[in-house]
From Swiss-Prot:
Strychnine binds at Y235, N236, T237, G238, K239, F240. GO terms for molecular function: extracellularly glycine-gated chloride channel activity; glycine binding; glycine-gated chloride ion channel activity; metal ion binding; transmembrane signaling receptor activity. Residues 278-282, 336-430 are cytoplasmic. The modification Phosphoserine is found at S370, S379. Coiled coil: none annotated. This is Glycine receptor subunit alpha-3. GO terms for biological process: chloride transmembrane transport; presynaptic modulation of chemical synaptic transmission; protein homooligomerization. It is found in: Postsynaptic cell membrane; Perikaryon; Cell projection, Dendrite; Synapse. The keyword Cell membrane applies.
């Protein structure tokens, strides 16, 4: 009996310790579960659960697959705007491109933060819009000191993707009013592979295009108003979403005023100095005329060096052509003055030749009339003898006229002739002193009114 009682005691003790151990294990599990509920999930575990291999997320498939298209809201912040080249017709810009869309697969509630800023390397793990710049000629990413990219995920599944880019974009220019022109350069954002059934781009409602404070351009004034438009593209492969922004750039002509207009104006005025130089100073006037013509030609060539070879006439071409015409006309004016002033020599030479011919002709005529007078006398005597004298008289009581001898004006002396032609040449110089500046002033009035006022207003009306 003692042995049985001892055995029962051992069995009851065993069950007691087993129950105690079981209770301790249950308490430990409850404590661990309570701790797990109170302690947040680690970021690594959360990301693995959200977009890891075990999450079932596939970056190759767009959100809302086989459903409504994904709406991507775009925003651009311009850091710098410059390097506008007329020869290649493009411009260079540095921007922050920001895209926002909703991916329901990335919505979460397990993590306490409202948003997560992820490393750029995570971009390969999620779906992204296939945006590209339709009028892009060259582009660069920025990797100093690290990739200039931002990825932010919000609780409701919204995704913000920002990237810094330097772009060279084409900008077809109309240079008819150069350098008083206003250019419109566009930036087109388009989907490369997704049609509008899958993806739609749209501008952000508030401040879709922002410009860095204090941004200035060396030759242009970037206007505050920017046109935001939709430019949906239709190709053989489908209809693709496209949005664009138009930048209006008004050229500041201060550089061209100093480098082109004022120097050419001074060259034209310098060519008028020859009108005040004595006409006998041929070397001085010819040298001045040729120098101004060559300088004007060089100036005209320089104005076209930085411009493309276009088929139409630009405003600067008209200015340079008219200035060259005035300078060349001033040189021709001296040629006319010199020609007129030397005409008395030619006239004297012509008179000498004519005088010699006239004297020879007069002698011949004198001898001819002498022979005729002798014959007439003989005839008169013979007719009178037969009573026919009155027949030699004219009818109606008119007497016959003798040979015509017009009254000849005495020719002027060589000095008088020289003075007449020199006065004519001086008169040409005197008229040129007034006519050339007046004609150039009239041209300036028409030129600046047409290009700076009338055409400028037409351009603004077209843009509005």
């Amino acid at each position: 009996m003692a042995h049985v009682r001892h055995f029962r005691t051992l069995v009851s003790g065993f069950y007691f310790w087993e129950a105690a151990l079981l209770l301790s294990l249950v308490a430990t599990k409850e404590t661990d579960s309570a701790r797990s509920r109170s302690a947040p999930m680690s970021p690594s575990d959360f990301l693995d659960k959200l977009m890891g291999r075990t999450s079932g997320y596939d970056a190759r498939i767009r959100p809302n697959f086989k459903g409504p298209p994904v709406n991507v809201t775009c925003n651009i912040f311009i850091n710098s705007f410059g390097s506008i080249a007329e020869t290649t017709m493009d411009y260079r810009v540095n921007i922050f491109l920001r895209q926002k869309w909703n991916d329901p697969r990335l919505a979460y509630s397990e993590y306490p933060d409202d948003s997560l800023d992820l490393d750029p390397s995570m971009l390969d793990s999620i779906w992204k819009p296939d945006l590209f710049f339709a009028n892009e000629k060259g582009a660069n990413f920025h990797e100093v000191t690290t990739d200039n990219k931002l990825l932010r995920i919000f609780k409701n599944g919204n995704v913000l993707y920002s990237i810094r880019l330097t772009l060279t974009l084409s900008c077809p220019m109309d240079l008819k009013n150069f350098p008083m022109d206003v250019q419109t350069c566009i930036m087109q954002l388009e989907s490369f592979g997704y049609t509008m059934n899958d993806l739609i781009f749209e501008w952000q409602d508030e401040a879709p295009v922002q410009v860095a404070e204090g941004l200035t351009l060396p030759q242009f004034l970037l206007k505050e108003e920017k046109d935001l438009r939709y430019c949906t593209k239709h190709y053989n492969t489908g209809k693709f979403t496209c949005i664009e922004v138009r930048f209006h750039l008004e050229r500041q002509m201060g550089y061209y005023l100093i480098q082109m207009y004022i120097p050419s104006l001074l060259i034209v005025i310098l060519s008028w100095v020859s009108f005040w130089i004595n006409m006998d100073a041929a070397p001085a006037r010819v040298a001045l005329g040729i120098t101004t013509v060559l300088t004007m030609t060089t100036q005209s060539s320089g104005s076209r060096a930085s411009l493309p070879k276009v088929s139409y006439v630009k405003a600067i071409d008209i200015w340079m052509a008219v200035c060259l015409l005035f300078v060349f006309s001033a040189l021709l004016e001296y040629a006319a003055v010199n020609f007129v002033s030397r005409q008395h020599k030619e006239l004297l030479r012509f008179r000498r030749k004519r005088k010699n011919k006239t004297e020879a002709f007069a002698l011949e005529k004198f001898y001819r009339f002498s022979d005729m007078d002798d014959e007439v006398r003989e005839s008169r005597f013979s007719f009178t003898a037969y009573g026919m004298g009155p027949c030699l008289q004219a009818k109606d009581g008119m007497t016959p006229k003798g040979p015509n001898h017009p009254v000849q004006v005495m020719p002027k002396s060589p000095d008088e002739m020289r003075k007449v032609f020199i006065d004519r040449a001086k008169k040409i110089d005197t008229i040129s002193r007034a006519c050339f500046p007046l004609a150039f002033l009239i041209f300036n009035i028409f030129y600046w009114v047409i290009y700076k006022i009338l055409r400028h207003e037409d351009i603004h009306q077209q843009q509005d």
